[in-house]
Amino acid sequence: MSYNLPIDELMAVMDNAVKNGYTFAWGSDVSEQGFTRDGIAVCPDAAKGAELTGSDMARWTGMSQADKRKELTSKPMPEITVTQEMRQEAFDNWETTDDHGMLIYGIAKDQNGKEYFMVKNSWGESGKYKGIWYASKAFVAYKTMNILVHKDAIPADIAKKLGL
């Protein structure tokens, strides 16, 4: 069976799964700028660049789009706040498409304590982390198209609502 869950419930299912030892299949959009070939998947808040002043602002405004993208994914940065409406709009206008399936199997934290899902990619031992990607919760919330998870990995309250 398949279900269309609101974003908060979808995230709760994924969190609950990995925190209880379950892996799950994850269909996502890897053509997004925030999905790097270096093993990071993030939704950086590019508008934060506009908050810079002085020489930092001059450096930012002089950067090419490619350099800005590299800068925004090179270290932990503030990310956009993903809403149900943003997610739906990206789906409806084909900005978000299902172009790759992977496995999510754990949670890691960066040096600031921010959580990332640990993703096993099928591209072999490529990238900085040898085939492992670290996908921020914002990226996963925004760009998940589908998941396949064992029904016992679903939180009890959500399972009850689904009649499982």
Per-segment meaning from a language model:
Residues 1-164:
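Active-site signature of cysteine proteases
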